[in-house]
């Protein structure tokens, strides 16, 4: 009588779960709280990124830890408190980015294999946390969407850096795509033009001209080859053409300079002061480089720069809201996402 001996081979791996696609919207970041401690934690992470401050040598580290993190957080905390969403206990940037993700998900319709999420490069929810969460939900393909219309190494590139740091630690990595900058995308330019015209139509005064203010950066970064300035110029040129306005009726400036190095010029605050001194009495400012309202738009422009304008002779000032989670703003993101998801849906 023969005996059948069982053969013990390697365990058979379970069948793979249905593949899902993750879409991750990413913006710059925000403190978890508007007190000095929360702002200090945020600034330490932000200013320790070599993409943001390229010279991370001993002098910078001494200045950061010995001076900046002991003086700047208290001042910036007061600024955050002016714009803080106290109902949700979070910054407007977090509120708006969440809404953008939720509305984008709804706009994409019933696609059970598609998951939309959002993250911040600095602060929370972190890129690491949300990428790991998407992978845990079965996402084998991931589209990262830096919410910066204009590319810069200090914004878009550092998002990619951090995403790859997270993937480097995963055995089963998702396939990764990153959306490109959309600084002259027709949907983006159309949305900006429509938003500007709609806001101006709601005013009780007519601005004499519009200032398009972009976040600044050190001139040295541009000299090293960063395309950011050229893309800002391209955005304003396309917007002028779309709106049919002359160059001197839609000016390009740069805000938020920090430290003692030369930054991109002309500076927004100096330009606004000069315009008021020259007799401009009614002014509008739009911030095309920001996909969502944040400290730099709601406090720096809408409050600080408004005060500068009024103190030097201005009479009427308006800060035009960013596209935010408006229908047009979400449509810009939706079109960008669908274009980059081709072959995955």
Swiss-Prot record:
SUPFAM superfamilies: Chelatase (SSF53800). Keywords: Cytoplasm, Heme biosynthesis, Iron, Lyase, Metal-binding, Porphyrin biosynthesis. Fe cation binds at residues 215, 296. It catalyses: heme b + 2 H(+) = protoporphyrin IX + Fe(2+). It is found in: Cytoplasm. Pathway: Porphyrin-containing compound metabolism; protoheme biosynthesis; protoheme from protoporphyrin-IX: step 1/1. One of its GO terms (biological process) is heme biosynthetic process. InterPro entries: Ferrochelatase, Ferrochelatase_AS, Ferrochelatase_C, Ferrochelatase_N. It holds the Pfam family Ferrochelatase. Its EC number is 4.98.1.1. One of its GO terms (molecular function) is metal ion binding. It is an enzyme of class 4 (lyase). Signal peptide: none annotated. Its main location: cytoplasm. GO terms for cellular component: cytoplasm. Catalyzes the ferrous insertion into protoporphyrin IX. Belongs to the ferrochelatase family. HAMAP family: Ferrochelatase. This is Ferrochelatase. It comes from Rhodopseudomonas palustris (strain ATCC BAA-98 / CGA009). The gene is hemH.
């Amino acid at each position: 009588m023969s005996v059948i001996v069982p053969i013990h081979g390697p365990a058979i791996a379970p069948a793979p779960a249905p593949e899902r696609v993750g879409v991750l919207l990413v913006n710059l970041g925000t403190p978890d709280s508007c007190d000095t401690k929360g702002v200090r934690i945020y600034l330490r992470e932000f200013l320790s990124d070599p993409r943001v401050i390229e010279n991370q040598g001993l002098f910078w580290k001494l200045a950061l830890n010995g001076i900046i993190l002991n003086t700047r957080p208290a001042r910036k905390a007061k600024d955050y408190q002016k714009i803080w969403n106290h109902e949700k206990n979070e910054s407007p940037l977090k509120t708006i980015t969440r809404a953008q993700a939720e509305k984008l998900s709804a706009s994409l319709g019933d696609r059970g294999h598609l998951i939309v999420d959002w993250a911040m490069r600095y602060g929370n929810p972190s890129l690491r946390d949300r990428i790991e969460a998407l992978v845990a939900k079965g996402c084998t393909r991931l589209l990262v969407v830096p919410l910066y219309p204009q590319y810069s190494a200090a914004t878009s590139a550092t998002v990619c850096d951090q995403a790859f740091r997270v993937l480097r630690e995963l055995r089963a990595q998702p396939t990764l795509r990153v959306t490109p900058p959309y600084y002259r995308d027709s949907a983006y330019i159309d949305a900006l033009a429509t938003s500007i015209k709609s806001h101006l139509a709601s005013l009780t005064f007519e601005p004499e001209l519009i200032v398009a203010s972009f976040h600044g950066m050190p001139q040295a970064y541009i000299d090293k080859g960063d395309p950011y300035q050229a893309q800002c110029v391209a955005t304003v040129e396309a917007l002028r053409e779309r709106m049919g306005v002359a160059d001197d009726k839609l000016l390009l400036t740069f805000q938020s300079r920090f430290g003692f190095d030369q930054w991109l010029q002309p500076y927004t605050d100096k330009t606004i002061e000069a315009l008021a001194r020259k007799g401009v009495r009614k002014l509008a400012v739009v911030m095309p480089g920001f996909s969502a309202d944040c400290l730099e738009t709601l406090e720096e422009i809408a409050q600080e720069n408004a005060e500068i304008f009024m103190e030097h002779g201005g009479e009427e000032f308006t800060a035009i809201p960013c596209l935010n989670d408006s229908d047009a703003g979400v449509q810009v993101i939706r079109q960008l996402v669908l274009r980059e998801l081709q072959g995955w849906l």
